[in-house]
Amino acid sequence: MEEHPTVLVLDDDPGVRTSMERLLKVYGYGAVSASTLDEAQEVLKTMPVQALILDVGLQGETTGLDLLLSIRKRPEFDKAPILIFTGGVLSDAEEALITRHRAFLFYKPEGFDTLVKFLDTLTGRDRPN
């Protein structure tokens, strides 16, 4: 994994996107964000991304799980760390889908520090003290 892996943050809440992007950069990650599934797919076509943080509940009919399903079909993302971050309650089927596609589930308001530590583990990085 790269020294400064780039993380794509998909969340429809501008405050969450901005906060996550800033904090990821503080912890030594590159960060880019998207508010919709279409924006995220465009980012993935144009930028090298090594990890993803996806919100489940997006405005409209698409979800972060839709991106999870499509991205795992692409060989370059087969082993990419994907964290699912949601404030809602998921069904057993949704949780099974997340597990089956090798993603990791975090419920808001899980501390961002916990999420970054887990991302550090998945990317093989040590977070600066």
Q: How does the language model describe each region?
A:
Residues 1-8, 110-129:
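Non-catalytic signal-transmission and effector/linker regions of two-component phosphorelay proteins
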Residues 11-12, 55:
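Acidic di-acidic motifs
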Residues 14-32:
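Two-component/phosphorelay signaling modules centered on CheY-like receiver
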Residues 47-58:
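Active-site beta3 strand of CheY-like receiver
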Residues 85-86:
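Hydrophobic/aromatic residues positioned on beta-strands within the core alpha/beta folds
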